[in-house]
Protein backbone atom coordinates (compact mmCIF):
# COMPACT_ATOMS: atom_id res chain seq x y z
CA UNK A 1 0.00 0.00 0.00
CA UNK A 2 1.20 3.49 -0.88
CA UNK A 3 -0.21 6.70 0.60
CA UNK A 4 -0.06 10.11 -1.11
CA UNK A 5 -0.11 13.23 1.06
CA UNK A 6 -0.10 16.78 -0.28
CA UNK A 7 2.41 19.31 0.94
CA UNK A 8 1.44 22.37 3.02
CA UNK A 9 2.17 26.07 2.51
CA UNK A 10 3.35 26.53 6.09
CA UNK A 11 6.83 25.15 6.74
CA UNK A 12 9.15 24.61 9.68
CA UNK A 13 12.67 25.99 9.39
CA UNK A 14 14.88 23.48 11.21
CA UNK A 15 15.18 19.99 12.64
CA UNK A 16 17.88 17.80 14.15
CA UNK A 17 16.68 14.54 12.59
CA UNK A 18 19.03 12.48 10.44
CA UNK A 19 19.91 10.65 8.26
CA UNK A 20 18.33 12.28 5.27
CA UNK A 21 17.67 10.81 1.85
CA UNK A 22 17.82 12.72 -1.43
CA UNK A 23 14.60 13.57 -3.27
CA UNK A 24 14.16 11.58 -6.46
CA UNK A 25 13.59 14.71 -8.54
CA UNK A 26 16.26 16.85 -6.84
CA UNK A 27 17.86 17.86 -10.15
CA UNK A 28 14.54 19.24 -11.40
CA UNK A 29 13.92 21.01 -8.09
CA UNK A 30 17.37 22.61 -8.37
CA UNK A 31 16.58 23.87 -11.87
CA UNK A 32 13.22 25.30 -10.77
CA UNK A 33 14.79 26.91 -7.70
CA UNK A 34 17.52 28.55 -9.79
CA UNK A 35 14.88 30.09 -12.02
CA UNK A 36 12.89 31.31 -9.02
CA UNK A 37 16.07 32.76 -7.46
CA UNK A 38 16.67 34.83 -10.59
CA UNK A 39 13.32 36.63 -10.15
CA UNK A 40 12.84 39.88 -8.29
CA UNK A 41 10.24 40.15 -5.53
CA UNK A 42 7.63 41.65 -7.85
CA UNK A 43 7.85 38.68 -10.21
CA UNK A 44 7.76 36.25 -7.27
CA UNK A 45 4.67 38.03 -5.95
CA UNK A 46 2.99 37.44 -9.31
CA UNK A 47 4.20 33.85 -9.81
CA UNK A 48 3.39 32.80 -6.24
CA UNK A 49 0.15 34.80 -6.11
CA UNK A 50 1.10 36.14 -2.68
CA UNK A 51 1.65 39.32 -0.69
CA UNK A 52 4.77 41.47 -0.94
CA UNK A 53 5.82 40.23 2.49
CA UNK A 54 5.58 36.56 1.45
CA UNK A 55 7.31 37.32 -1.84
CA UNK A 56 10.21 38.93 0.05
CA UNK A 57 10.44 35.98 2.46
CA UNK A 58 10.51 33.52 -0.41
CA UNK A 59 12.98 35.60 -2.38
CA UNK A 60 15.34 35.07 0.56
CA UNK A 61 14.55 31.35 0.66
CA UNK A 62 15.39 30.93 -3.02
CA UNK A 63 18.58 32.98 -2.65
CA UNK A 64 19.70 30.52 0.05
CA UNK A 65 18.23 27.39 -1.53
CA UNK A 66 21.57 25.64 -2.07
CA UNK A 67 23.13 26.56 1.27
CA UNK A 68 20.19 26.31 3.70
CA UNK A 69 20.08 23.42 6.17
CA UNK A 70 17.92 20.56 4.94
CA UNK A 71 15.17 19.01 7.02
CA UNK A 72 13.13 15.82 6.53
CA UNK A 73 10.07 16.47 4.38
CA UNK A 74 7.77 14.87 6.95
CA UNK A 75 8.92 17.42 9.54
CA UNK A 76 9.18 20.40 7.19
CA UNK A 77 5.49 20.95 6.50
CA UNK A 78 3.22 22.49 9.11
CA UNK A 79 -0.31 22.23 7.68
CA UNK A 80 -3.36 20.56 9.25
CA UNK A 81 -2.60 17.04 8.03
CA UNK A 82 0.96 17.29 9.36
CA UNK A 83 -0.17 18.63 12.73
CA UNK A 84 -2.49 15.64 13.12
CA UNK A 85 0.19 13.26 11.89
CA UNK A 86 2.43 14.45 14.76
CA UNK A 87 5.55 13.41 12.87
CA UNK A 88 7.82 14.67 15.68
CA UNK A 89 6.47 11.86 17.86
CA UNK A 90 7.00 9.04 15.34
CA UNK A 91 9.38 6.28 16.40
CA UNK A 92 12.27 5.10 14.25
CA UNK A 93 10.15 2.10 13.29
CA UNK A 94 7.25 4.39 12.32
CA UNK A 95 9.56 6.52 10.17
CA UNK A 96 10.98 3.44 8.46
CA UNK A 97 7.44 2.30 7.63
CA UNK A 98 6.51 5.78 6.39
CA UNK A 99 9.65 5.89 4.24
CA UNK A 100 8.42 2.78 2.40
CA UNK A 101 4.73 3.65 2.15
CA UNK A 102 4.23 7.44 2.20
CA UNK A 103 4.75 9.88 -0.66
CA UNK A 104 4.44 13.65 -0.31
CA UNK A 105 3.48 15.57 -3.44
CA UNK A 106 4.67 19.13 -3.94
CA UNK A 107 5.17 21.66 -6.71
CA UNK A 108 8.92 22.20 -6.26
CA UNK A 109 10.30 18.73 -5.53
CA UNK A 110 7.55 16.77 -7.30
CA UNK A 111 7.39 13.72 -5.08
CA UNK A 112 9.09 13.19 -1.74
CA UNK A 113 9.67 10.41 0.73
CA UNK A 114 9.32 11.39 4.41
CA UNK A 115 13.07 11.47 5.11
CA UNK A 116 14.05 13.33 1.93
CA UNK A 117 16.01 16.43 2.88
CA UNK A 118 14.39 19.66 1.70
CA UNK A 119 14.63 23.37 2.43
CA UNK A 120 11.69 25.71 3.10
CA UNK A 121 10.18 27.10 -0.10
CA UNK A 122 6.93 28.24 -1.64
CA UNK A 123 5.73 27.18 -5.08
CA UNK A 124 2.23 27.59 -6.45
CA UNK A 125 0.45 25.30 -8.88
CA UNK A 126 -0.09 28.14 -11.34
CA UNK A 127 3.55 29.28 -11.59
CA UNK A 128 4.78 29.19 -15.18
CA UNK A 129 8.51 28.96 -15.75
CA UNK A 130 10.83 28.58 -18.72
CA UNK A 131 11.97 25.31 -17.14
CA UNK A 132 8.41 23.98 -17.44
CA UNK A 133 8.17 25.14 -21.07
CA UNK A 134 5.90 27.98 -19.89
CA UNK A 135 3.30 25.51 -18.69
CA UNK A 136 1.77 25.77 -15.21
CA UNK A 137 3.88 23.82 -12.73
CA UNK A 138 1.01 21.46 -11.90
CA UNK A 139 0.78 20.39 -15.56
CA UNK A 140 4.55 19.98 -15.71
CA UNK A 141 4.52 17.59 -12.74
CA UNK A 142 1.34 15.79 -13.78
CA UNK A 143 3.03 13.99 -16.67
CA UNK A 144 6.18 13.14 -14.73
CA UNK A 145 4.41 11.89 -11.61
CA UNK A 146 1.79 9.92 -13.52
CA UNK A 147 4.55 8.07 -15.37
CA UNK A 148 6.48 7.53 -12.14
CA UNK A 149 3.56 6.30 -10.04
CA UNK A 150 1.96 4.06 -12.68
Functional labels for PLM-detected ranges:
Residues 87-150:
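Internal, well-folded beta-alpha domain core
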Amino acid sequence: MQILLANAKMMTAASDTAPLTEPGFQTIADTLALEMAAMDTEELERQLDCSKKLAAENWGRYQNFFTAAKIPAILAYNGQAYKHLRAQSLTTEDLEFAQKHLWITCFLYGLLRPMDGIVPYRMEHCATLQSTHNRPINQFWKDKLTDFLI
